[in-house]
Regions:
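Non-catalytic alpha-helical scaffolds and adjoining flexible linkers that form interface surfaces
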Residues: 1-192
Length: 192
């Protein structure tokens, strides 16, 4: 009998696999980025389908197979696609898509998970300019955590504060051009 692992996960992407199954790209708190197969997740009556939607934060139960992880359960914690307005949803999708492309291999990196979950939690409470700055900070911090940027990350991984001129978002708004240049350089260095 295989051991079951439970962890929190962000669903970065999902790809159809067969008639009713999916392979989900999950950024997990305990195992890093993994690909997991969910049998029957595309059925309308599937219990796990809500917890396996792109832009969902879920508590998942996983089984380690010979070649791939398998989903044994998924309980939806937050469906960010429903919580965010259209503009914020596009920002979140861009950041999670980039994370899916940049993060390689299975290794625990709680900082990456914290960066992205904090970013998602901050979006509904921010103005459009602050959301733009939060998107830049999330990408910059992700690049820093992956080792392709060594500059200032404008605070802690979960700091998307606003309100004062010294806040992370205010500083990012002020330094927008420099941040975009650093992000573009980091993406180039990553080899994408």
């Amino acid at each position: 009998m295989r051991h079951k692992y439970s962890t929190r996960a962000l669903v970065l992407a999902r790809i159809p696999a067969g008639e009713e199954s999916i392979t989900a790209s999950l950024l997990t708190e305990d195992f890093g980025l993994i690909r997991a197969r969910s049998q029957g997740a595309r059925k309308g009556s599937a219990k796990m389908s809500a917890g396996m939607q792109t832009l969902s934060e879920s508590d998942v139960t996983l089984l380690r197979g010979k070649d791939i992880w398998r989903m044994a359960g998924a309980v939806l914690e937050t469906n960010w696609a429903r919580e965010l307005d259209a503009a914020a949803r596009k920002r979140a999708a861009r950041v999670l898509e980039l994370a899916d492309r940049l993060i390689r291999g299975e290794h625990a990196d709680p900082e990456l998970f914290l960066i992205l979950t904090s970013f998602l939690r901050a979006l509904p409470e921010r103005t459009e300019d602050e959301q733009d700055a939060a998107e830049m900070l999330a990408v910059l911090r992700m690049l820093h955590a992956l080792g392709v940027d060594a500059g200032d990350t404008y605070g802690e991984p979960d700091d998307y504060s606003s309100g004062s001129e010294k806040s992370a978002l205010a500083r990012a708004i002020e330094d927008r051009s420099a941040l975009i240049a650093r992000i573009n350089h980091g993406i180039t260095e990553s080899g994408l």
